[in-house]
Amino acid sequence: MKKQMFLSAMLLALCLASGLTAQAQNTDPDDANLETQLYLIVGTNQDVDEARLPASLDGVVKQLRASLPFKNYRLAATLINRVKNEGRLQLSWIGGPLASVSGAASGGASPVTPSFSQFNVRQVKLQRNSENQSVVQMLGFNFGARIPIQVSGAIAANGAVAPNFNYENTGVSTDISMRESEPVIVGTLNVGPSGDAIILVVSAKRAPK
C-alpha cells in the first residue's frame, strides 16, 4: 500500500514538473515575436491643415510641442513589421512620404528623381531594466534617406530650363531601449531648405501568437 502511494506521489510530482517546464518554455522570451512600429512625423511651420495624429502618439506630440518650434505636425507614414526576438530587421524603399516632403520643400523629388530610404535594426531584443520592467532594446538602429535637392537649372538649346539635382544624405544611427508599447522619439531630420523636419518615433511590443 505504501509502495503504491509512493509511486502515485512520484507520478504526480513528475506531471507537475512537466507542466511547469512546458509553461516556462511557452513564456520563454527567446520564442517571442515582436511587432515594431516606426512613425514618420512631419514638423512644419507652413500654414497647412493639421491632421489628427493617432491617440497612441498623444504623449509624443505633447513632448514635441514643448521642445520643437514647429506650428503643425502630421503623420506621413507608419511602418509595421514583425521580427523574432533577438532577430534583425531590414527595409528599403523608393519614393513614399519623404518624396512628398522633400518635393514640397525643394521642388526636388518626383518620379524621375525619387527619394531612397532604408531602415535597419541589427538586433531587436527583449530585456529587463533595473526596475524589472520588460523593455525592448534596439541595437544598431539606423534610418537613412537620399533626397534630391534642386541646386540649379541648365538652359537647353531651345531655351528651356532643365533643373539640376544633387542627392543629399540624411539619417540617424543609435542604440535605444524602450518600455513595451511606449512610443519614443529617436531623432529629427531636416528636409530641404524650408526648415521642415521628419521626426522619427518608434515603439515595439510582443506580437500575438
Regions of interest found by a model, annotated:
Residues S8-G19:
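Bacterial N-terminal signal peptides
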Residues K2, A22-K209:
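Outer membrane pore-forming secretion/assembly proteins and partners of Gram-negative envelopes
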Residues K2-S8:
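Twin-arginine (Tat) signal peptide motif
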